UniProtKB/Swiss-Prot annotation:
It comes from the Bacteria. Involved in the modulation of the specificity of the ClpAP-mediated ATP-dependent protein degradation. It comes from Bartonella henselae (strain ATCC 49882 / DSM 28221 / CCUG 30454 / Houston 1) (Rochalimaea henselae). Binds to the N-terminal domain of the chaperone ClpA. This is ATP-dependent Clp protease adapter protein ClpS. GO terms for biological process: protein catabolic process; proteolysis. Belongs to the ClpS family.
Length: 110
């Protein structure tokens, strides 16, 4: 026990406030890939617009992903935790709907 004397001679105990060491059991959050799916109707320039607007890709990155969508049927926009991935998908789907494009955006567990 650790004791110190205050100004008026009272003793203060330190050990009452010491927390035992505990191991943290925090787990890394699960990550999800956000993917754009190819269709025959959405213009390539709209896909680039979406990638730049919602995924903060520069033109070269957006072009690379757009070509992957076009050639392979799918392109990875980014890897996020669940909440962020879900929000990105909602944003893309709403933007596509407002612009009357059938662009689909999905997530899959990494």
């Amino acid at each position: 026990m650790h004791n110190e004397k205050g100004k008026n001679g009272d003793e203060y105990r330190h050990d009452a406030f010491i927390m035992p060491k505990m191991r943290s059991k925090l787990q890394k959050p699960k990550l999800y890939r956000v993917l754009l799916l190819d269709d025959d109707y959405t213009p390539m320039d709209f896909v680039i617009f979406v990638l730049k607007s919602f995924f903060k890709k520069n033109f070269e990155e957006a072009m690379h992903i757009m070509l992957s969508v076009h050639q392979n049927g799918v392109g990875e926009c980014g890897i996020y935790n669940y909440e962020v991935a879900e929000m990105k998908i909602i944003q893309v789907r709403e933007c596509a709907r407002q612009n009357e494009h059938p662009l689909q955006c999905v997530m899959e567990w990494k």
